[in-house]
């Protein structure tokens, strides 16, 4: 009986003699070791399931288990992360060396809060604001406790969407991260949490406090689960 592994074209063949290491699969274990070593020698990054050996039918089912991983790898190579501002003081957990992003195929564009503030001010009086305000009113319903702030929130949402379209370049997907405090509320005149949530629901993950790895994690979770994270 021949059993196929998911690693390239390597075959893991059951030892017909029965004189093997474990459960009649000594040759299969040896084949997996050699396949793994060959991949490493060639610097090929491969996914090996916890139980990588099976019949043709079983391996076909394993491919479905690999689909979320494949989606994530493809999507990461089409992702651009856009950040605004340095991480806040003492938010050491938000430290994100960008070299690791490039190592997995992700691009990043780092901007200052001042860049975002300038773009926001340029969107004052934008003709699209009333339509977004109406959307927000319908979405919030009885939870609309601060209706006077909705025009600014709509202005901010439009600002971010325009920035994404103008800066994503050849990348298909964008994830955002920015600061929420302490100066944001006093200078912009609102907190951005609601807009962040709306954009995330629309397929643009947003994290706060310039948590670059955080928004990356949100994006991966969205791609893998095919749902909002």
Tell me what each language-model feature is:
Residues 1, 84-88, 180:
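Structural motif
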């Amino acid at each position: 009986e021949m059993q196929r592994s998911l690693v390239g074209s390597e075959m893991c063949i059951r030892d017909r003699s029965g004189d093997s290491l474990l459960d009649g699969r000594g040759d299969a274990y040896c084949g997996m070791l050699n396949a793994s070593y060959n991949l490493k020698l060639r610097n090929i990054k491969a996914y090996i399931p916890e139980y990588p050996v099976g019949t043709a039918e079983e391996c076909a089912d394993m491919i479905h288990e690999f689909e979320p991983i494949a989606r994530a790898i493809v999507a990461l190579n089409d992702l651009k992360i856009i950040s605004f501002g340095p991480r806040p003081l003492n938010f050491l957990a938000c430290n994100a060396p960008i070299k690791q992003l490039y190592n997995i195929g992700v691009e990043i564009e780092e901007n200052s809060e001042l860049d975002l503030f300038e773009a926001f001010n340029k969107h004052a009086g934008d003709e699209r604001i009333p339509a977004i305000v109406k959307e927000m009113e319908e979405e919030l319903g009885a939870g609309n406790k601060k209706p006077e702030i909705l025009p600014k929130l709509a202005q901010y949402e439009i600002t971010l969407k325009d920035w994404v379209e103008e800066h994503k370049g050849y990348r298909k997907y964008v994830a955002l991260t920015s600061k929420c405090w302490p100066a944001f509320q006093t200078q912009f005149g609102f907190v951005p949490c609601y807009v962040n949530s709306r954009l995330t629901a629309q397929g643009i993950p947003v994290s706060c406090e310039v948590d670059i790895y955080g928004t990356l994690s949100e994006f991966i979770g969205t791609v893998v689960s095919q749902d909002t994270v």
